[in-house]
Swiss-Prot record:
Chain segments annotated as transmembrane: none
Protein name (record): Large ribosomal subunit protein bL31B
NCBIfam families assigned to the protein according to its UniProt record, in alphabetical order: L31 (TIGR00105), PRK01678.1 (NF002462)
Molecular functions (GO terms): structural constituent of ribosome
SUPFAM superfamilies hit by this protein: L28p-like
Gene for this chain: rpmE2
Entry-linked Pfam families: Ribosomal_L31
Keywords: Ribonucleoprotein, Ribosomal protein
Native source organism of the sequence: Porphyromonas gingivalis (strain ATCC BAA-308 / W83)
Cross-referenced PROSITE patterns: RIBOSOMAL_L31 (PS01143)
Biological-process GO terms, alphabetical: translation
Xref: HAMAP family: Ribosomal_bL31_2
Length: 85
């Protein structure tokens, strides 16, 4: 590895998904203001709003958005602009 280009503070960090309280330990250079103790070891704690354990794409619990009503409303208001008068 090339010397002098890699971060010095690459260490184990805990990421906590705040939507479902899941935690996972990985290596990161992110700075943390809080710490958490897991199995007797203190780690820096990074809180995230969403992760792979709660994101609909990864969980398969996709939320369907009903846009058909919006399209119908638009078409009734403005009609088909491509029609020749």
């Amino acid at each position: 590895m090339k010397k002098g280009i890699h971060p010095e503070n690459y260490r184990p960090v805990v990421f906590k998904d705040m939507s479902n309280e899941d935690i996972f330990i990985t290596r990161s250079t992110m700075e943390a203001k809080e710490t958490i103790e897991i199995d007797g070891v203190t780690y820096p704690l990074i809180k995230v709003e969403i992760s792979n354990t709660s994101h609909p794409f990864f969980t398969g619990k996709a939320k369907l958005v009903d846009t058909a009503g919006r399209v119908d409303k638009f078409m009734s208001r403005y009609g088909d602009r491509n029609k020749k008068k």
